[in-house]
């Protein structure tokens, strides 16, 4: 006696399950993109406000010293990178929200573009945060070999703001790294072979 598995029953159940899982992943991605955008905005704003003016006595005269983020190229690089990540994540999150509401599915080309941009921006943000960390280390500790003096004893507020911006930027980078994994999973799931009904035979 032989049995036959109905094509509709065999194909629809896995399809609905994978569809729900896919939409759940997209929803998590939207939330994480808003988080990454907010973190990058916070890192950017901390740098924009990062300036300090102090007065130092030289002989009998008071000399005014000022430092700001724009004096350091690594901090400028970090600021623009955070701005780019914030704009990218915000608009892509909005596009994803409209896609979820309209129950529309993105194609493979859009998946590849998102995957490449997520990966690229994660690496660029990592590079910017790492370069800024090195500069901050020199500002806090100096370098005797190159005769660079530390400045954080004089510009404590400046160093504190820079440190906070770097920490927030690293958190945004971690969010981008997770998004890279998620976009890779969504992209390569489009290349999986569709499930087909199989004929079952009793021996």
Curated annotation (Swiss-Prot):
Residue spans crossing the bilayer: 28-48, 74-94, 109-129, 164-184
Highest taxon in the source lineage: Eukaryota
Ranges per topology, Cytoplasmic: 1-27, 95-108, 185-203
Cellular localisation: Cell membrane
Membrane topology value: Multi-pass membrane protein
Transmembrane helix found in the keyword field: yes
Predominant subcellular localization, coarse grouping: membrane
UniProt GO cellular component terms: plasma membrane
Keyword Iron part of the UniProt annotation: no
Region of interest (Disordered), ranges: 1-21
Keyword annotations: Cell membrane, Glycoprotein, Membrane, Transmembrane, Transmembrane helix
Extracellular topological intervals: 49-73, 130-163
Glycosylation sites: 51
Family: Belongs to the Casparian strip membrane proteins (CASP) family.
Oligomer status and interactors: Homodimer and heterodimers.
The name this protein goes by in its record: CASP-like protein 2U2
Organism, as annotated: Osmunda lancea
